[in-house]
């Protein structure tokens, strides 16, 4: 008799054990590929800068999508159902094999072509960087025009076909292939898990396949199922996908739980029945919950439109409908009204400020999937504008305030770069920027680092810290932020060179006004602020806290620069004087000593706050002039309390914040 070859033994087999082991090997191969993608993503995210993809965000998204699809459709489902189910289910049923042995072989051979399509999807052109849910319009032809997304969808079709064939085989095996005397109630819980999983696969996978088919038609046949301009609705795909997606995580986790419980409670029949009932109800609810939520939302939107005639317009956006739904729900919920009363303090500026800041910080959060982000501000949840009567905390003004804060930060950053920063180009044509500040201003650099990336390092031999940014993505973001806000003559030359290398146009420098934060950033970098006593031997003089004979104190604010044209706008806007200092190769100093000019500058800083410790001294200026008018710096028996106040002021002034 001719011996069976290795290929025939494993690839042509209809034995449930052989096919189960083949499923297991295929799943391990897919798992290794998915693990490789996971390692790439973890290497990229191991540091704030780009470590592996060199700023290529599309490549990262492709790895994320490929990793998720491989792990779900090519590892978890084939191993749990194909490998363990095929191997153990017939033995637990007392059956010789599966009900349809050749169908079992066909269901496996749908997977290798699907894996080839999945790998080609990752490697071809720009890849499918849509996330594992492939939501439109990100997966539509306008966003991903190549064949990568089509190949990913073909892979999902083939895996769905494999799962459907396997599900039919499992269900028939459980129903018809049990040994004599083995009733459904007496089956092991593992068999129940396989049976219910197969049943739900049979119900949910056609819905997912239909959703993917409609998306393929939109991409290749110019239909408009998910195109808003053609009368379609992209949210329909979300509902169809999660009819399947809401089910599978719960199902596979339950397999582990109930299989473990099976061995502990095998002899307790009533507990077995309870677990079976719980298992069936849990899986049924997991399959129905998305449909019930969608139905509830549609009913609420319909009711809102009937109550509000202006909402019947056809161009009402989903965001507007979402706001209408949330406002109606908040009006009907007494508990929500009771909770929102805690935030209704229109006269309390501190509470209003806290609400303003928190609403900007926690304005949005993830809903459901890795790609769907839903904006649900605090105003929509529990603080409508008609309840508080305060227009300063409505959603529109929050957005305007956010844009204003962003522009102010960019102007301040440009001023800081003009003062203490520099741009450079390496021999390999890589761009970078550096910035050096005092050691006590480390928090300032942390703000910049959190926004743009980069690294910080202490300077040896100096009480200063240096910030360095060298990755391309961070440099592009920095250039976009400060372009058009730079004013320093030398920095503008460097900016032109860097922007030329990055293929970015250079905008004209902005005009310096009191509503512009550039001077604040420049003062944080190159400005000084101190007061001194003019020594005198006059008998009417007094003693400072340091015991020196002195005249009245003099407060001075100054900014230095090498170029006269850079400091002239300071004098035109805020007054003061400019003189040339020959020390240190010569530089121009803009300084002010008069009370009027200094308080004018303090008002400017309050309007455009400093982000360094210099702000602490700036806020002490009014106290300085109050104590100076009272001559608190004079040491005599008549003003001991005032002199103590002056000493306390000096301690605050010299404190290292």
UniProtKB/Swiss-Prot annotation:
COX1 exons 1 to 2 encoded: annotated span: 1-245
Main location per the UniProt record: mitochondrion
PTM entry text: The mature protein may arise from proteolytic cleavage of an in-frame translation of COX1 exons 1 and 2 plus intron 2, containing the aI2 open reading frame.
Transmembrane segments: 19-39, 69-89, 103-123, 152-172, 188-208, 269-289
Gene Ontology biological process terms from the UniProt entry: electron transport coupled proton transport; intron homing; mitochondrial electron transport, cytochrome c to oxygen
Topological relation to the membrane, as annotated: Multi-pass membrane protein
Classification via Pfam families: COX1 (PF00115), LAGLIDADG_1 (PF00961)
Subcellular location: Mitochondrion; Membrane
Molecular function GO terms recorded: cytochrome-c oxidase activity; endonuclease activity; heme binding
PROSITE patterns: COX1 (PS50855)
Superkingdom, natural source: Eukaryota
Enzyme Commission number(s) from the entry: 3.1.-.-
Keywords (A to Z) from UniProt: Endonuclease, Hydrolase, Intron homing, Membrane, Mitochondrion, Nuclease, Transmembrane, Transmembrane helix
UniProt-listed Gene3D superfamilies: Cytochrome c oxidase-like, subunit I domain (1.20.210.10), Homing endonucleases (3.10.28.10)
Region (COX1 intron 2 encoded): 246-657
GO cellular component, one term: mitochondrion
Task performed by this protein: Mitochondrial DNA endonuclease involved in intron homing.
Similarity annotation: In the C-terminal section; belongs to the LAGLIDADG endonuclease family.
Protein name as catalogued: Probable intron-encoded endonuclease aI2
UniProt source species: Debaryomyces hansenii (strain ATCC 36239 / CBS 767 / BCRC 21394 / JCM 1990 / NBRC 0083 / IGC 2968) (Yeast)
